Amino acid sequence: MLRLPTVLRQMRPVSRALAPHLTRAYAKDVKFGADARALMLQGVDLLADAVAVTMGPKGRTVIIEQSWGSPKVTKDGVTVAKSIDLKDKYKNIGAKLVQDVANNTNEEAGDGTTTATVLARSIAKEGFEKISKGANPVEIRRGVMLAVDAVIAELKKQSKPVTTPEEIAQVATISANGDKDIGNIISDAMKKVGRKGVITVKDGKTLNDELEIIEGMKFDRGYISPYFINTSKGQKCEFQDAYVLLSEKKISSVQSIVPALEIANAHRKPLVIIAEDVDGEALSTLVLNRLKVGLQVVAVKAPGFGDNRKNQLKDMAIATGGAVFGEEGLNLNLEDVQAHDLGKVGEVIVTKDDAMLLKGKGDKAHIEKRIQEITEQLDITTSEYEKEKLNERLAKLSDGVAVLKVGGTSDVEVNEKKDRVTDALNATRAAVEEGIVLGGGCALLRCIPALDSLKPANEDQKIGIEIIKRALKIPAMTIAKNAGVEGSLIVEKILQSSSEVGYDAMLGDFVNMVEKGIIDPTKVVRTALLDAAGVASLLTTAEAVVTEIPKEEKDPGMGAMGGMGGGMGGGMF
């Protein structure tokens, strides 16, 4: 029997032989205090500098290399922020934290990402400087948040509700970098579908921007067979006052659809069949009857896949007042169909590529309840794909959908413009929600006097308040700097002027901001400050930073190649 010491002695040579191969992957590197903060600040500076150049009406664009396709040209702050990834791990941590500020602001308000980024840089930079001189970072953070609360309260006092289409157009124009055409098209869209209506942005097919209003439920599935066409003009099938049969399952047998056809025939109504598929003898019988006796029917494949298809069919059932056959939990068979199981619509248009159900006769209360359910799902989902699909479903159930088709001469131009249109649309929605304040960074400047009355608990909190006082000047200074003038002089002149006067960077003049329509949504300014202060003041409290040391790849060397050559040589003869 072997004793334990003997076993261990025998294992030693083995462990020595294996030692070079048993290396730890992903070891960590730790930096403390001023060293760590200095490196993070360099990352913050790099990201903020790249984003800041896009600010204001005379801001420049940024060109971003992409892993595929042509480079992206943009003036959208959050797009620039997201594209930055630094090689140095410590610098990258600083950059990523400010990137989070831009992302949060974009998700909550849809605009104001550049403002949030320059504010975050200012707060972090000043905070680091004060801490290096011995101030307490925790108390500085308390002072910063105290000042931010006071500024937000003051912003709410300054805020005015958006009432007219002209004001909506002004907000959209400012956010679209002074493009009045974009401002007007968004204002028109809101006029047509209502302020809470659904507005989507898509690539256009022409050189000009277009606005299309879609009423009812439109989905991208056309007729299954061209024999269903009933108009000579436009290769489409059109019905007035029709019944709708909805099925989750494939329809192949004729017997299953005869009862529905008999009901439609008895009521002298056309029938629209929307199912997973219609094929076999069911399809051939429908086509034959359509051609021989002029049967008023059209078959369409249900849109989407999996759960998305089920949800869309359920939406159609609610919008038209019908039921979905084959739905889990409901023992509804197509053979037992009754008139009340069929949906009812005022008008149906089916083309080769899409179908539209207009003037659905569904119960308004049920539709409202369904809209509420989808809105609640939207609030909790984090997936961008899910959000897109939920928004599409919401749009179809709402009164109408406005589609902004962005035109241009090339993909690069369309994509750049699309970024601005999306920003403008988000800013407009934010303005309708919480009102408007002076634009051009003036609203934040007008909040500075409100900080004078604050009573900090100690000297370090007072430093935090002073940090915010200086940060509030940064957006206006950045806009002026991008317009080629001295920012600090512009800011001082604005502070000495009456409350509605600000700097119009486009004209290079001091004007009444409200009369000129240079306004920002309150929600955008508030969110930008809150997110920037929260993350930047947390950044200043960091005393240690832990990063992963990249795994070193061993150089295989050239020895293997030589051996391989010899082996091959030996094998050849």
UniProtKB/Swiss-Prot annotation:
Keywords for the protein's UniProt record, in alphabetical order: Acetylation, ATP-binding, Chaperone, Isomerase, Isopeptide bond, Mitochondrion, Nucleotide-binding, Phosphoprotein, Transit peptide, Ubl conjugation
One GO term describing the cellular component: intracellular membrane-bounded organelle
EC annotation from Swiss-Prot or TrEMBL: 5.6.1.7
Main location: mitochondrion
MF (Gene Ontology): apolipoprotein A-I binding; apolipoprotein binding; ATP binding; ATP-dependent protein folding chaperone; cysteine-type endopeptidase activator activity; double-stranded RNA binding; enzyme binding; high-density lipoprotein particle binding
Positions that bind ATP: K75, D111, G112, T113, T114, T115, G440, D520
Modified residues (Phosphoserine): S67, S70, S410, S488
Protein name per UniProt: 60 kDa heat shock protein, mitochondrial
Family: Belongs to the chaperonin (HSP60) family.
Keyword Acetylation: yes
One of the GO BP terms on file: apoptotic mitochondrial changes
Modified residues (N6-acetyllysine): 75, 82, 87, 91, 125, 130, 133, 156, 191, 202, 205, 218, 236, 249-250, 269, 292, 314, 352, 359, 389, 396, 455, 469, 481
Cross-link (Glycyl lysine isopeptide (Lys-Gly) (interchain with G-Cter in SUMO2)): K551
Keyword Cell inner membrane found: no
Source species of the chain: Rattus norvegicus (Rat)
Enzyme class, UniProt record, top EC level: isomerase
Residues bearing PTM N6-malonyllysine: K133
InterPro entries reported for this sequence: Chaperonin_Cpn60_CS, Cpn60/GroEL, Cpn60/GroEL/TCP-1, GroEL-like_apical_dom_sf, GROEL-like_equatorial_sf, TCP-1-like_intermed_sf
